[in-house]
Amino acid sequence: AEDFEKAAIDYIYKTMKENKNIVFNGNGYSDEWVEEAAKRGLPNVKSIVDAIPAYTDESSIEMFEKLGVMTKRELEARREIKLEEYAGLINIEARTMIDMAAKLYIPSVIAYVNSVASSMSTVKNAYAQADTTAQQTILVKASSLLADTQQALDNLKAATDAAETAKDFHEKVLPAMAALRTPVDELETIVDSEYWPVPTYGQMMFEV
């Protein structure tokens, strides 16, 4: 072009005009973008399980084959491999979580609960009028969370054993993992660190 600067500006203007429907300068991590994407008719892909099938969308196949990058069969293979990788990864994470809850957290909490109960008995035997409200509050709370943990663990085991596809792991196993983490995280704030089987968040953040 004779006037490079003008040609560049014209090209930028043309490109912006043609693609303005996908430009968003707000918070892409908030509901603001979800609402805006819906207004623009853009897909809202919430997880990798939802994204992977795009490998074999007609438009994807057409583009990859046109450019000589991959064939339809290769794209289908890649889609299946990615879905299997995801399912395998979540399966490993879930079973690791099950193992840790069953062999580390639950036994440690039981030991702590027994210790608190024994402490209450010892204090009461020494002085019948002693106020053990604090110990009782801890005992009740820890026991309740222990029951929640066991129930969540059973649910996660069932979900993991039944899961067969990436969709199963995403829609059933991941929520079950989150449900197990909730009471365990709360127990970490209650159980004496001497009984807790792994470093706490506080120890990792401030004592390392």
Residue ranges with predicted function:
Residues 1-5:
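An acidic, glycine-/histidine-flanked metal-binding catalytic module
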Residues 12-208:
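C-terminal amphipathic alpha-helical interaction region
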